[in-house]
UniProtKB/Swiss-Prot annotation:
Lineage: Bacteria, Pseudomonadati, Pseudomonadota, Gammaproteobacteria, Enterobacterales
Main subcellular localisation: membrane
Catalyzed reactions: citrate(out) + 2 Na(+)(out) = citrate(in) + 2 Na(+)(in)
Subcellular location: Cell inner membrane
Record-level GO cellular component terms: plasma membrane
NCBIfam families assigned to the protein according to its UniProt record, in alphabetical order: ccs
Entry protein name: Citrate/sodium symporter
GO biological process: citrate metabolic process; sodium ion transport
Function: Secondary active transporter that catalyzes the uptake of citrate across the membrane with the concomitant uptake of sodium. Is specific for citrate.
Listed transmembrane segments: 23-43, 46-66, 79-99, 110-130, 148-168, 213-233, 267-287, 289-309, 335-355, 364-384, 425-445
Length: 446
């Protein structure tokens, strides 16, 4: 009887632990209700293709695969953990035909038609920049562009060396490998690069783009992996890392900002107002007022970084409003990131492109170029007054990934979402710098 009683108690304890297990903060029975609802919707192919249907699908799917990615050994340390697991599984669901067309449409409407990605990035930029000491922000922005240039130089040198080892000429390495990888992603990088290539050389833009996007896809994977590795290095060698802070304050001495008082929901709502209005102003500037400078188009997120920085420097925002914007930014980055990554996997990740690009030479060359970007940005950042880990992530890896969605993948892999403003400078302003370099390189080939 004693043994039976103990066995019964053990079974009850096991059942109790299972019922208390939480997925995305929800007890297992409650999550099971949400999952069963989603499966019914999938079985009957009945899902509204609007924000409600899209968010329901993205929340439920992101929750389960986020928990798996967070707990999976090796993957959670070296590959990027939950966010990377989510977008890879979501991309596979599209590739394998598991998602119905209605489900793809629902997610696409959230990401593309409603452009949730723009809102997500706008909120993170506003919160990240307004939370930084005003004087420190201005000094760091002035030093950041040279750090980006150091990353480009590092990527070019490493790329040329490894290219020569494979018997590839210098001009071809720069044209087909270094520039696409460091060019700011797909829409702001590979696409305009192919147009510049066509207009300068007269050759096929399609031929250039197909090669460029394949190389960029491989580099983006390495950027995510290296981000996770850099996070581990920073934890072991703490003097190399600012734990999410880019600037070494010993190098940029400033007075502390005034402390915020009590923060209410209203200040958080004001953070949303500032995020959307600053984005709107940046969009107007980029599309109508100053669509290009010296023939180079500047992306609206690059303008937004400058606008929010100017707003911070102006002193118009009280400490409470700044804290409200930071609270909103934290909510998006901590509670909605898994949701967003489902959309990234469905809308911005093509597994077939990744598979097609996996040749030995392409993999090795792309990896070495990304390493060069990391080394160059780390050295340049250290000399200017930044932490090497953070400068190599933002000015190195966020130059070598695939733009806005790549920034989120890289920063989530190394747990540094608060660096999104610098990542956007890399993807947008840095990408513009690469387009200027491309115009020169391509013209030398004619």
């Amino acid at each position: 009887m004693t043994n039976m009683t103990q066995a019964s108690a053990t079974e009850k304890k096991g059942a109790g632990d299972l019922l208390r297990f939480k997925i995305f903060g929800m007890p297992l029975p409650l999550y099971a209700f949400a999952l069963i609802t989603l499966l019914l919707s999938h079985f009957y192919n009945a899902i509204p293709t609007d924000l409600v249907g899209g968010f329901a699908l993205m929340f439920v799917m992101g929750a389960i695969f986020g928990e798996i990615g967070k707990r999976l050994p090796i993957f959670n340390k070296y590959i990027g953990g939950a966010p990377v697991m989510i977008f890879l599984v979501a991309a596979y669901f599209v590739y394998a035909g598991i998602f119905t067309q209605k489900e793809i449409d629902a997610i696409s409407n959230v990401m593309d038609k409603s452009n949730f990605l723009n809102l997500f990035i706008a909120v993170l930029i506003t919160g990240a920049i307004l939370s930084v000491n005003r004087k420190l922000l201005l000094k760091s922005l002035l030093g950041y562009i040279p750090t980006i240039l150091a990353g480009i130089v590092g990527a070019s040198l490493f790329g040329i060396v490894i290219g020569l080892c494979f018997g590839i000429p210098v001009d071809r390495i720069m044209m087909l490998y270094v520039l696409p990888i460091m060019g700011g992603g797909n829409g702001a990088g590979a696409v305009p690069l192919s147009e510049i290539y066509h207009s300068v050389t007269g050759r096929s833009r399609e031929e250039y783009y197909s090669t460029a996007i394949a190389i960029l896809t491989i580099a983006n994977i390495f950027a995510i992996i290296f981000a996770a590795l850099l996070d581990m290095i920073g934890k072991k060698y703490t003097w190399l890392s600012g734990e999410g802070e880019l600037v070494r304050k010993a190098s940029f001495k400033t007075e502390d900002d005034e402390k915020a008082g009590q923060i209410t929901h209203r200040e958080t709502a004001v953070g949303m107002v500032l995020s959307t209005t600053c984005f709107l102003l940046a969009y107007v500037v980029a599309k109508k007022i100053l669509p290009s400078i010296g023939g180079v188009s500047i992306h609206y997120f690059a303008w937004m970084v400058l606008i929010v920085a100017a707003l911070n420097a102006s002193g118009l925002c009280s400490p409470e409003i700044k804290a409200g914007a930071k609270r909103l930014s934290d909510f998006f980055s901590k509670q909605l990131l898994w949701v967003l990554m489902v959309g990234v996997g469905v809308c911005y990740t093509d597994l077939q492109e990744i598979i097609d690009a996996l040749t030995f030479a392409n993999v090795v060359i792309a990896a070495i170029i990304v390493v060069g970007a990391v080394v160059g940005a780390a050295i340049g950042g250290w000399l200017i007054g930044f932490y090497p880990i953070e400068s190599s992530i933002t000015a190195g890896l966020c130059m070598a990934n695939r733009g806005g969605s790549g920034d989120l993948e890289v920063l989530s892999a190394c747990n540094r979402m608060n660096l999104i403003s610098y990542a956007q400078i890399s993807s947008r302003l840095g990408g513009g710098i690469v387009l200027v370099i491309a115009s020169i390189v391509f013209s030398m080939m004619v």
